[in-house]
From Swiss-Prot:
Catalytic activity line of the entry: alpha-D-glucose 6-phosphate = beta-D-fructose 6-phosphate
Gene name tied to this protein: pgi
Domain of life: Bacteria
Gene Ontology biological process terms, A to Z: gluconeogenesis; glucose 6-phosphate metabolic process; glycolytic process
Function: Catalyzes the reversible isomerization of glucose-6-phosphate to fructose-6-phosphate.
Compartments, record wording: Cytoplasm
Cystine connections: none
HAMAP family: G6P_isomerase
Protein name (Swiss-Prot/TrEMBL): Glucose-6-phosphate isomerase
Protein's organism: Legionella pneumophila subsp. pneumophila (strain Philadelphia 1 / ATCC 33152 / DSM 7513)
Database matches in NCBIfam families: PRK00179.1
Amino acid sequence: MIRNSMKSHTELLSWNLLQKEADRVRLNSDSLTCVVPDSNNYESSKQINCIEYDYSRQRVNRTIIDLLIDLANEVKLQEKIDNLINGKKINISENRPALHTALRDLGNKSIMIDGLDIMSAVINTREKIKVISNQIREKKWLGHSGLPITDIVNIGIGGSDLGPRVCINALSNYISKEFNYHFISDVDPASFNDVIAKINPQTTLFIVSSKSFTTKETLLNARKAFALYEDTASIDQHFIAVTAHPERAYQMGIKTVLPIWDWVGGRFSFCSAVNLITAIAIGYEQFVELLAGAHDVDTHVQFTDFKNNIPVLMALIGIWNNNFLNIHNLLILTYSKKLEYFVPYVQQLDMESNGKSIDVNGSMVDYATGPIVWGGLGNQAQHSYFQLLCQGTHRCVGDFITLKTNDEHEINSMCHYKMKVLSEGIQTIENPYGYIPGNMPMNHLILSDCSPYTLGALVALYEHKIFVQSVIWNINPFDQPGIESAKSAHREITLSSES
C-alpha cells in the first residue's frame, strides 16, 4: 500500500518562492527573449575541460538560480552527492550503494562496502580488460581453429547494449579498423540473422553481458550463438561473459567471465567491463582516457560550488522547467553523426532512473518527476519534427549538443540558426501562418572534440544531472520496480497460458 506523503518537497520555503517567480515569468511569457530580465548580471556559460555549457537561452535569472540553489541546499544535495561517491547505501530499496563512480576512479583511495575495499576488485578487473583487449588487438587471442579474431559481437540489452553502441559509433576516429563490430540486443530473429550473415564464427568473439545473467533476450541470443559451434570445447575462445553472477555463466558453458557488481546499476555500467568491446576497439590506453573524462566530472560535481557546477546547474534548471514552468519533455538534439546513439542512451538513463511517482518514503509524490526524453540527430529534425517545435502546441525544453571542430562548421551553423528561431521566434512577418512564438528554453553543450575523454565526461555529466534531479524529487534513481513488477506479471501470464 502506498503511504500518504509525510512532508512534500512542495512545502519547502524555496519551492514556494520559486513558484512565485514562475508566476511572474508566465505573466511576461510574450517576451522575445528566453532569458528573464534581471538587474543582476550573471555569467550564463560554464566550462569543464572539454565541455562548455551555455544556458543563456533558458528562462532564468540570478534570482531564480539563487532560489534553485537554496532548494538544493534545503534537500541537502551536497551531502547526497558525497554519499553517492563515498559508497553510502543510497539505493535504499535494494539496500546497497550505487558506485558507478568507483569504476572510473583512477586514484589510490579506498572505498569500503561492508568492511571490504572494493577498489582492489575494480583494479583487478581493469587489468583483465587490459590483458584481453591487448591479446585480441595483437592477434594473440585465437579461436578454436587457431585463427585470430576478426569480429566482435556484443550480446546484451539496455545498459549492456546502449553504452557500448554509443562508444563504437562516437569513437569512429579511434577504433581499430582491423575488426568488425556488431550488436545483438533484440529477440527478433532478423536482428540475429543479419549479424550472423556477416561473420565467420571461427574468427568471432561473442561478449555476453547481463548483470543477472537471467535476461531472457540476452540468453536466447547467446544460446543461438552457441549453436554455431560443434561442441562446448570449441566455444571456449569464442565467448566472454560479463555478469554479477559468474556461476550462471559457468553453468552455461562460458569459462572466461569478467565481473560487474550488484552496486553498479545496469544503466550506469558505462565504465565497467560491459564496455569491453570498446576497450578492444580503441585500445586499453584510450579506454582509460574514457574513464578519466568521467572521473574528472565526478570530481567536478563533488567539489565545485553549485553556482559553477555544470551537472548541478543543468539539473536545477531542468527542475525549474519541469516543475515550475510545467514543461515536461526534454528534446536532445546532437549535431554530429558520431553522437547518433547518445539520445537513446540518455533516454534510457533518464526515464528508467527518474520515471517514478513514489518517493523514497513509499509515498505518492504530488509533483512532476522525470520528463519524457526524446530527440535524435539535429540535422534530421529539420525534415521531421522541426515544424512542431516551431508552431506546435506542445512545449519543449532543448539540449543542443555540438562539436567545436573545423569539419562541423556547416552543421553547427544549422544548429545556431535553429536555436535562434526557437528561442527568439519570428514575430515581424506579414504572413500570419509564418508566425513562430519562440520562447523555447534550451541548453547548448559545446564539446571540444569527440575523443574518449570527452565522451566519458559527457556521459558522466548526464549521469550526475539525473542523480541531482532525483534528490530534488526525493526518489530513488537506482531501482526499477515498475519493470520488475511488469516482468512478474508477464511470468504469471505465461505460466497461466501454459497450464
